[in-house]
């Protein structure tokens, strides 16, 4: 924060301070201690309110930014003061406030708050560190709270749909099944009771941030309680005639088995959760339980009573109101002094507080317009097209087959894969895997087993992450949960490791895999990948990626080396989990591998020695990987919320020394394209990978173990090339692929020429190869956006940065902080006398850093400087530290796309079939080519059928052809040609709803 800090005038500053005081004193009625803390943070950060970079928060209006700023300050103070001695002395005072109260006073909604919070964190982070200590970000738990909100939004809708399926609100069947909430805002007391009981279950039986699968099991147990106790006059079903209830012998319908069948949950887990739910009812509501088999109630008619507990007066009209009040008070006490979300908001009808639009949480999102993915640039072998049938087990079969999958049902499906495919496997290496382990120079079986136990214990500790104090049943349940997740990850690890060893032995024609099986980093990457899939399946809020990297001691670059192999060698992996791994690799490529502490830099300084000075000056090298003994000692010494091993959090501070840290990536055996999705459980739209011509695909792939060899070791498959050089070249080719997808999306959205696309693509490649340091500590999209504007300026195009940013906002991968917060090291820039490091807006970065470095390259590509087609090899630059290294990827024209989708169903006729759902259509089809397509159930014109649309489309494509009433498959002239389909199938990113906020309100930069 060494940049210029413009401060408002004394008069303006006094007015802002007065409004903040009013906000705290009258709006939230803060006590003196909390107000003093809030005022201190306000005074420390007040100068930031007047900076131009903050004007883009919210709608860009100063008053709007001010309200956000006030809310951020109060949220930070509330969260970070928890657990302090001063706060503990206050106890459960009456001045407690939570996030919802802050937002009501500031007139903001939850979605917008979490969207803008990252900007505050980036700007005020150093101040928060000074005031609250280095662990402030962990204690703030902003990402966890956001993911928790997303999960609860999904769960509340799931619960509402389920409630409407079984109950009415008026004692008779509902005529309108769209909402539990009536026009007057009334919510059924039974519906409210169920949600409050669910919240009590989360507070007393689950940990604070429980995973989605466990919470879904909890909701199913709540449904069982409601079915057993809500008066039958409110049922919208009958036990004997409801087709989705399975029967069990002569005793009647097995309620829990039926509900588990409907909602794809584990019956064993739901029965255990049911016990916890009954205990909450006994402990909090003081109701007396009795065995259902010993009770006589009309509610129990035709239900098998075995194993069920019944509470005589639980939902009697006389006691329901009292029970709701007790649950309300219990929840109030639980959240009083925690600045968390008041989870009752989901049944209070406060839509204005909830907000609308897209908000991601882990691998999930809530969105009106589903977030699409940029294709992941991984030269991985295609396993199956996502257009092909899903091979994972239990995909919404039976009665569910006609239901559109929801985030919850999809999560339960992947959980079923773990339960049915992975859980039955042995928890130790199989005989085949042991054969490989014992065939090494020394038997490594015991080492592999010990490492798996230590690493997975670090990822899934017996005490929940971040818990201040967990006692009783919640602690026991977390311990059991962690043990189950460890076993699932371990079994998956052994299974995939065996498959990899088998494949590697075939490549090497030998069973001795000592180099691979004794490599510590390889095994940790495999364990991290296995654990991440388990965490992604259960949607664990407290272990959002990249938490597994921190706890295993590996870096993003390390993990990127095993993802594609992991996918390829686990054929049963559900499609959603494949997409999750692919989305992680995209995140690694776009920014994480460029962050400080990435082991990529350890390979880069070997492959390109001229960059070592800059890498060392910025302190970018990875720290040595912590030893297994260090991790084991930390586990034994840990108790609850202790932070991870210190070295896992300080990878950026010192260079790595282990030879295997700088592990180069192996060449893949197949460079075909793969369809992937980013948001695993939101039915995202699938884009395709680009096939690049600059990869040396004709060379045989080296064995997997060479990927983890020392960077300085010669690569036996590439004469005269070190493993580091091979790895960096492959890594760069993947970056270029990802950039090609994103460049193409922006060109389509901006409606630019194909020549402009070629030029931007060429410039990006040249920057990557000749000005590599521009990527350090930055996001590749920041470079892409600058490439667009730089070429537009030099080509004298009428394209402003404002237009570029406005259209970039509509791209699926857009996050506001990408163009609002770009890393700058002024000491290396030597501009304007500035020193130090800070984050600036993208226009400042463009003017001060990008243009001085890239201007010569722009001149080469711009008018009069040649075109991409004339430049097959990047010219060497004398005395340039970023000069292209030997044998780096050559500059290539923009890649052509493989003919993958729609699928050609006839070799004789030009007929293509694409089983698109309507939710996926928009992003696959560009604005310019949308009129060529018709999707079942949608029309290109009002009040027309798809069959008429097909005729209309063919008429437009063949204007000289006579009108036909139906498609004639014998007449090629009447059908869409191959060339037209190929031309139309450039990767498009669709029309995603623009994120809130205005474009940058800054002057256009000058070159």
Curated annotation (Swiss-Prot):
Protein's cellular compartments: Nucleus
Function (record text): Regulator of biological processes that recruits a histone deacetylase to control gene transcription. May play a role in the entry into mitosis, negatively regulating the cell proliferation. Formation of stable complexes with geminiviridae replication-associated proteins may create a cellular environment which favors viral DNA replication.
Annotated family: Belongs to the retinoblastoma protein (RB) family.
Name of this protein: Retinoblastoma-related protein
Region span, Disordered: 644-665
Region (Spacer): 605-725
Gene name of the record: RBR
A Gene Ontology BP annotation from the UniProt entry: regulation of cell cycle process
A UniProt-annotated Pfam family: RB_A
Keywords: Cell cycle, Nucleus, Repressor, Transcription, Transcription regulation
Region (Domain A): 406-604
Main location: nucleus
InterPro entries assigned to the protein according to its UniProt record, in alphabetical order: Cyclin-like_sf (IPR036915), RB_A (IPR002720), RB_B (IPR002719), RB_fam (IPR028309), RB_N (IPR024599)
Recorded GO CC terms: nucleus
Annotated segments matching region Domain B: 726-856
Region feature Pocket, mapped onto this chain: 406-856
């Amino acid at each position: 924060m060494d940049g210029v800090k413009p401060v408002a005038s004394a008069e303006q500053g006094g007015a802002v301070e007065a409004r903040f005081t009013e906000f705290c004193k009258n709006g939230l009625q803060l006590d003196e201690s909390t107000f003093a803390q809030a005022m201190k943070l306000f005074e420390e950060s007040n100068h930031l309110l007047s900076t131009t970079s903050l004007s883009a928060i919210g709608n860009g209006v100063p008053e709007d930014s001010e309200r956000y700023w006030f809310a951020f300050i109060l949220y930070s103070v509330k969260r970070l003061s928890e657990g302090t001695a001063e706060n503990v002395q206050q106890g459960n005072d009456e001045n407690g406030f939570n996030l919802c109260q802050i937002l009501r006073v500031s007139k903001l909604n939850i979605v917008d708050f979490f969207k803008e919070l990252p900007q505050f964190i980036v700007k005020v982070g150093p101040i928060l560190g000074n005031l609250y200590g280095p662990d402030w970000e962990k204690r703030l738990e902003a990402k966890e709270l956001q993911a928790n909100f997303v999960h609860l939004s999904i769960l509340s809708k799931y619960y509402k749909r389920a409630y409407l399926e079984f109950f009415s609100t008026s004692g008779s069947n509902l005529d309108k099944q769209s909402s539990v909430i009536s026009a007057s805002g009334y919510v059924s007391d039974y519906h409210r009771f169920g949600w409050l009981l669910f919240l009590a279950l989360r507070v007393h039986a689950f940990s604070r941030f429980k995973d989605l699968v466990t919470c879904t099991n909890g909701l199913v147990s709540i449904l069982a309680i409601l079915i057993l106790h809500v008066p039958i006059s409110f049922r919208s079903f009958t036990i004997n005639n409801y087709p989705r209830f399975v029967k069990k012998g002569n005793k009647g319908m097995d309620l829990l088995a039926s509900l588990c069948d409907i909602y794809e949950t584990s019956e064993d887990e739901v029965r255990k959760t049911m016990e916890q739910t009954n205990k909450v009812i006994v402990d909090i509501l003081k109701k007396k339980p009795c065995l259902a088999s010993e009770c006589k109630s009309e509610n129990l008619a035709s239900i098998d009573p075995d194993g069920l507990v019944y509470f005589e007066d639980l939902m009697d009209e006389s006691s329901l109101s009292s029970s709701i009040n007790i649950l309300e008070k219990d929840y109030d006490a639980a959240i009083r002094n925690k600045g968390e979300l008041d989870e009752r908001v989901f049944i209070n009808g406060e839509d204005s507080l909830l907000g609308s639009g897209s908000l991601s949480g882990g691998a999930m999102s809530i969105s009106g317009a589903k977030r699409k993915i940029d294709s992941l640039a991984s030269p991985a072998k295609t396993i199956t097209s996502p257009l092909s049938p899903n091979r994972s087990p239990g995909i919404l079969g039976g009665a569910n087959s006609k239901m559109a999958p929801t985030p919850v049902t999809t999560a339960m499906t992947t959980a079923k894969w773990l339960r049915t495919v992975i859980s039955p496997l042995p928890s130790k290496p199989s005989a085949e895997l042991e054969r490989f382990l014992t065939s090494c120079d020394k038997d490594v079986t015991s080492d592999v087993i010990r490492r798996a136990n230590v690493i997975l214990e670090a990822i899934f500790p017996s005490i929940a992450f971040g818990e201040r104090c967990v006692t009783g049943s919640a602690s026991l349940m977390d311990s059991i949960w962690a043990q189950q997740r460890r076993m699932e990850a371990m079994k998956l690890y052994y299974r995939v490791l065996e498959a990899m060893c088998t494949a590697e032995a075939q490549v090497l024609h030998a069973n001795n895999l000592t180099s691979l099986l004794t490599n510590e980093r390889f095994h940790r990457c495999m364990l991290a990948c296995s654990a991440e899939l388990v965490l992604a399946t259960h949607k664990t809020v407290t272990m959002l990626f990249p938490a597994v990297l921190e706890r295993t001691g590996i870096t993003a670059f390390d993990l990127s080396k095993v993802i594609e192999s992991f996918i390829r060698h686990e054929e049963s992996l559900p499609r959603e989990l494949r997409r999750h791994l692919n989305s992680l690799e995209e995140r690694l490529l776009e920014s994480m591998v460029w962050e400080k502490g990435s082991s990529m830099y350890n390979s880069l300084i070997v492959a390109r020695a001229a960059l070592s000075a800059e890498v060392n000056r910025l302190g970018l090298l990875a720290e040595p990987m912590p030893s297994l003994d260090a991790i084991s000692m930390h586990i034994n010494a840990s108790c609850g919320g202790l932070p991870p091993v210190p070295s896992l959090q300080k990878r950026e501070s010192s260079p790595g020394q282990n030879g295997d840290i700088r592990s180069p990536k192996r060449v893949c055996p197949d460079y075909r394209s793969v369809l992937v999705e980013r948001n695993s459980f939101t039915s995202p739209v699938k884009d395709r990978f680009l096939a690049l011509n600059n990869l040396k695909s004709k060379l045989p792939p080296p064995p997997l173990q060479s990927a983890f060899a020392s960077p300085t070791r010669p690569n036996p498959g590439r004469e005269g090339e070190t493993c580091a050089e091979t790895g960096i070249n492959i890594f760069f080719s993947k970056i270029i692929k990802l950039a090609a997808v994103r460049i193409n999306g922006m060109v389509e959205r901006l409606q630019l020429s194909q020549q402009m696309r070629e030029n931007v693509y060429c410039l990006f490649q040249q920057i990557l190869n000749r000005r590599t340091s521009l990527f350090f500590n930055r996001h590749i999209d920041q470079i892409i956006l600058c490439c667009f504007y730089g070429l537009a300026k030099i080509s004298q195009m009428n394209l402003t940065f404002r237009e570029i940013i406005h259209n970039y906002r509509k791209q699926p991968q857009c996050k506001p902080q990408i163009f609002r917060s770009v890393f700058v090291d002024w000491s290396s820039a030597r501009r304007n006398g500035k020193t130090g490091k800070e984050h600036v807006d993208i226009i400042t970065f463009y003017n001060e850093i990008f243009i001085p470095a890239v201007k010569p390259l722009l001149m080469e590509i711009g008018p009069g400087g040649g075109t991409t087609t004339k430049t097959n090899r990047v010219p060497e630059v004398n005395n340039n530290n970023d000069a292209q290294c030997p044998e780096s990827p050559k500059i290539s024209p923009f890649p052509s796309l493989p003919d993958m989708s729609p699928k050609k169903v006839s070799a004789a006729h030009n007929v293509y079939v694409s089983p698109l759902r309507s939710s996926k259509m928009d992003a696959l089809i560009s604005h310019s080519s949308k009129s060529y397509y018709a999707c079942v159930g949608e029309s290109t014109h009002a009040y027309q059928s798809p069959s008429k649309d097909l005729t209309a489309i063919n008429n437009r494509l063949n204007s000289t052809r006579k009108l036909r009433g139906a498609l004639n498959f014998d007449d090629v002239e009447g059908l869409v040609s191959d060339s037209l389909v190929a031309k139309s199938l450039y990767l498009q990113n669709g029309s995603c709803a623009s994120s809130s906020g205005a474009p940058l309100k800054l002057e256009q930069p000058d070159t």
